[in-house]
Amino acid sequence: MEIQEISKLAIEALEDIKGKDIIELDTSKLTSLFQRMIVATGDSNRQVKALANSVQVKLKEAGVDIVGSEGHESGEWVLVDAGDVVVHVMLPAVRDYYDIEALWGGQKPSFAVGAAKPWSAV
């Protein structure tokens, strides 16, 4: 399955559970570990867990191998590793504190869900 298709499925899974501030970053020029990073926010620990679970279920149903996931216990920051696509789901305070978008080069997101797209989508 193409990276863009995996990303699209992950974003749809996040939207299904009302994830907020969903962005996709193209990390292909920054690391060889993965091609895309998707970041989303959940309003509560329970929603963060549900968002991550939704991503895992949707990707598995499409035949995508899940390499691993972490953070389900606390529900503050859950990571889902689908190989070339990595999904981070966080509480708002955790996302603000770690600001991983800035850590990955301070780049503009390649895709912001639900927002005007002043730059081209991947």
From Swiss-Prot:
SUPFAM superfamilies: Nucleotidyltransferase. GO terms for biological process: cytosolic ribosome assembly; negative regulation of ribosome biogenesis; negative regulation of translation. GO terms for molecular function: ribosomal large subunit binding. InterPro entries: Iojap/RsfS/C7orf30 (IPR004394), NT_sf (IPR043519). One of its GO terms (cellular component) is cytoplasm. It holds the Pfam family RsfS. It comes from the Bacteria. The keyword Repressor applies. It is found in: Cytoplasm. Keywords: Cytoplasm, Repressor, Translation regulation. Functions as a ribosomal silencing factor. Interacts with ribosomal protein uL14 (rplN), blocking formation of intersubunit bridge B8. Prevents association of the 30S and 50S ribosomal subunits and the formation of functional ribosomes, thus repressing translation. Interacts with ribosomal protein uL14 (rplN). HAMAP family: Iojap_RsfS. Belongs to the Iojap/RsfS family. This is Ribosomal silencing factor RsfS. The lineage of its organism: Bacteria, Pseudomonadati, Pseudomonadota, Betaproteobacteria, Neisseriales.
